[in-house]
Amino acid sequence: MTNLTISKNKAFLFYIMKYLNKKDIKKTEEFISLFANVKKCKDEKQIDMLTALYGSGPAYYVFFNEIINNAFLNMGFNKKDTILYTNNLMLGTSKLIQEEPKAEKLLRSIASKGGTTEAALTQLKKNRVDALINKAIKQAYKKSRKILLK
């Protein structure tokens, strides 16, 4: 699977090593850890799940980022400001998530009762955006399994 976040030292590399001895596994992990986090997986099925979630994950963020970009542009902001605002929004939000990994708590601190954010989130939930995203991820998983089985 592609791993573009490796260029930013924010990657995980997932592996299965059934046929190597412990010494070789240790050497391999030490080498990979020079440029990425390393995580051993139990089987190919787990690798396929991680391909759908982690390997394709940057595309999900970029896709959502593009939606926000287009919203800025549609509201009349220029392209230069739009890119600046959207990139800062994504980076800042990423840092907030690192500090408070519980999404529910973080969302409560952002969305005031009866406010603009609550209205937007209500619309997203009403349109079952979460179900659409989960369906897309399941499709990626199915495709990963299909590729493996070829």
Where are these regions (language model features)?
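Rossmann-fold dehydrogenase core element
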Residues: M1-L4, E29
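Short coil/turn segments
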Residues: T2, K18-L20, G55
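Short, charged, surface-exposed secondary-structure boundary motifs
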Residues: S7-A11
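Internal alpha-helical scaffold of NAD(P)-dependent oxidoreductase catalytic cores
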Residues: F12-M49, Y60-E99, K143
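A short glycine-threonine-serine/GTX helix/turn-capping micro-motif
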Residues: D48-A59, L107
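Short, electropositive, low-hydrophobicity segments enriched in small/polar residues
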Residues: A59-Y61, E118-A119
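NAD(P)-dependent Rossmann-like dehydrogenase/reductase catalytic/cofactor-binding core
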Residues: L84-N87, L91-K150
